[in-house]
């Protein structure tokens, strides 16, 4: 397949992308066992040595210091070269949802204590905000952080936490002022070994099976004052900042997976013959391929536009939201089309049905697509308003 994979990248970024693709193909093959915990740790350490777990972290802390565009290119290459999108998702969630808040809001002491090992792959981070009663309504958390001498005591539960079964540190959002709204949340760095912190059994998910996910419980879990990330009451702004990274750079991994499946689908319809000729020559098939390519390219343009705004400091809420919507919806539809064009082979164990299963959660995590549309509508001045009082 011959269409541009460079997106205007400079030579250094193209070389980095190609290196990541080669590494992923050579070292990150899971032999089909995407849910093997021991193999997950092996591959994580290899990814750390390659610099993938700290791409956007400054060099002084062991990272590569990449900007958002180069980081997105790296994640796209990882998604393209690694058949396990769940593993790529775990790397991206570690980096953009948990490590970047430490980079942007941590004290010098916190950065020095955590970032080197998080970059090298020796340690893994997880971001814990979602709760059974607080999904899209993320500001109304029931996990409480009660102030005590020299620290806080955390009580509550989190669910659907990516990397929870393997995490060494959790970036936890908790309510310090339940009535404070946007300013009522505080972010904490909580070590996995902290007394009172327990992790539930890993979920058995329909997709992203290579990404370990579980509940996390805090039972009167004491954390010292030095565990507060940023200022008390700044948790919502920290979360919002991390979501700009996640909705942009994390979703680049899906671009790589889409391209990989799109290429193999084109090869399939060229080779598969029915009625005496390749099925790619049938208009119904060729038009579907063109639609797949158009969705992929459109989503890619939106994502890299959002990445460039992150790099130059002009990012708002709209760009990452549109990128997240476009990529996730394109991935689901591309997966459906790839399955359909393979016929019976599409519902067997293979990369087409794997992409479809891995893409379904993408419309939900990082803020559901419906919530993203609300955010964009509000930015356009179309938010919900109270009805005018009747006279």
From Swiss-Prot:
Gene3D superfamilies: Acyl-CoA dehydrogenase/oxidase, N-terminal domain, Butyryl-CoA Dehydrogenase, subunit A, domain 2, Butyryl-CoA Dehydrogenase, subunit A, domain 3
Record-level GO BP terms: fatty acid beta-oxidation using acyl-CoA dehydrogenase
Example GO molecular function: acyl-CoA dehydrogenase activity
Residues that hold FAD according to the record: 272, 283
Active-site annotation: 246 (proton acceptor)
Keywords for this protein: FAD, Flavoprotein, Oxidoreductase
Entry EC number(s): 1.3.8.14
Enzyme class: oxidoreductase
Catalytic reaction equation(s): L-prolyl-[peptidyl-carrier protein] + 2 oxidized [electron-transfer flavoprotein] + H(+) = (1H-pyrrole-2-carbonyl)-[peptidyl-carrier protein] + 2 reduced [electron-transfer flavoprotein]
Classification via InterPro entries: Acyl-CoA_Oxase/DH_mid-dom, Acyl-CoA_Oxase/DH_mid-dom_sf, AcylCo_DH-like_C, AcylCo_DH/oxidase_C, AcylCoA_DH/ox_N, AcylCoA_DH/ox_N_sf, AcylCoA_DH/oxidase_NM_dom_sf, ProlPCPDhRedW
Cofactor(s), by name: FAD
NCBIfam families: ProlPCPDhRedW
Job description of the protein: Involved in the biosynthesis of undecylprodigiosin. Catalyzes the desaturation of the L-prolyl-[prolyl-carrier protein] to yield 1H-pyrrole-2-carbonyl-[prolyl-carrier protein].
Family: Belongs to the acyl-CoA dehydrogenase family.
Protein name, UniProt field: L-prolyl-[peptidyl-carrier protein] dehydrogenase
Organism the protein comes from: Streptomyces coelicolor (strain ATCC BAA-471 / A3(2) / M145)
Gene: redW
